[in-house]
A protein has these predicted regions:
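N-terminal non-catalytic cap/leader segment that marks the start of a structured domain
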Residues: 1-109, 113, 282
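A generic local secondary-structure boundary/capping motif
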Residues: 4, 74-77, 103-106, 130-140, ...
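Short beta-strand segments
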Residues: 7, 87-88, 117, 143-151, ...
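Short acidic-glycine loop/turn motifs at beta-strand connectors
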Residues: 9-10, 19-24, 150-152, 221-223, ...
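Catalytic-pocket segment enriched in acidic/His residues
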Residues: 13-14, 50, 54-57, 67, ...
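A gly/proline- and charged-residue-enriched helix-loop-helix capping module
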Residues: 109-127
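Non-heme Fe(II) oxygenase catalytic core, chiefly the N-lobe of the double-stranded beta-helix
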Residues: 125-162, 167, 172-175
Length: 297
């Protein structure tokens, strides 16, 4: 199943929908039948667990009125995250190696996942503009990533059980201000500018992705291919990420994890390349979907 957060083009509050086809969305606010979650809130749906999934399957199998996708505005599927977005750095060997060439000091490949976060306010819609302010940063860079959405929460999750805690997947671009990263000598600030985490275009539930460890992912800028890889090249696989992140830290339903980016980022190119106002950034993960974001308002 593919789940969206949308609002009608004519206006109205955002609400949760279920894609019936590639071109139609069922408005869960109008289905009735006493859903076991708040149909205006994706976090509530995810927290609803198996009862919510069972109810959605009944909706998907029934005959329901739907709205044309072209008549709605898609928001980030989780538009108001309850917590920061968890991220994994240096999780593709080729990206670590390209970064090593651009770094002034030698850094050893981590023996454990390198975690950091992006502020909750970074989350942006799948087709919304990414803010650009040259007085803040002139080195805005791209990073395609597979986004993982936690379903059942947990703490100290065994690696063998980790995938049972996945609700679904989405596309993420971990947009990064490289000059700010260097200025502060850490990741958080340079990766936490408002609107710097386009997410979506929907959540694909975990049962619909046969092998999340074998998905092509790519970035295009103005139509030119910049990143092209596959999640099979993840250095730390998804179960390891979940298990290590949950050590002593309770993961909650709706938590978002960006699992790392492959090579091809702008700062490691010769000469370096960065996004400019008017550029169109396209971010795609096989089996999930495509984000298309213009740089600048």
């Amino acid at each position: 199943m593919r789940l969206v957060t949308f609002s009608p083009q004519a206006g109205g509050a955002p609400r949760v929908g279920l894609l019936r086809t590639d071109d139609e969305v069922i408005d869960l606010n109008h289905v009735g039948g006493n859903p076991p979650f708040d149909p205006a809130d994706m976090n509530s749906l995810i927290a609803g667990g198996e009862k919510a999934i069972s109810w959605l399957r009944d909706v998907a199998s029934g005959s329901r009125d739907a709205v044309a996708l072209g008549q709605v505005r898609l928001h980030a599927p989780i538009s108001n995250p309850r917590r920061n977005v968890y991220c994994v750095g240096w999780n593709y060997l080729d990206h670590f190696e390209e970064g090593a060439k651009a770094r002034p000091q030698k850094v050893d490949l981590p023996a454990h996942p390198a975690f950091f976060t992006k502020a909750a306010g970074t989350v942006n819609g799948p087709y919304d503009a990414i803010p650009f302010d040259a007085s803040v940063s002139t080195q805005i860079d791209w990073e395609v990533e597979l986004g993982l959405i936690i379903g059942p929460g947990g703490k100290n999750i065994p690696e063998a059980d980790a995938m049972k805690h996945v609700f679904g997947y989405a596309v993420i671009n971990d947009v990064s201000a490289r000059d700010i990263q260097r200025r502060h000598n850490q990741w958080f600030k340079g990766k936490s500018l408002d609107g710097s985490c386009p997410l979506g275009p929907w959540i694909v539930t975990s049962d619909a992705i046969r092998d999340p460890g074998n998905l092509r992912l790519s970035t295009r800028v103005n139509g030119a291919l910049k990143q092209d890889s596959n999640t099979r090249h993840l250095y730390f696989k998804l179960p390891r990420i979940i298990a290590e992140l949950s050590l002593g830290l309770t993961l909650e339903p709706g938590d978002i994890i960006a699992t790392g980016t492959p090579s091809g980022v702008g700062y490691a190119r010769t000469p370096p390349e960065f996004l400019k106002p008017g550029d169109v950034l396209e971010t795609e993960v096989e089996g999930i979907g495509l984000l298309r974001n213009r740089i600048g308002n």
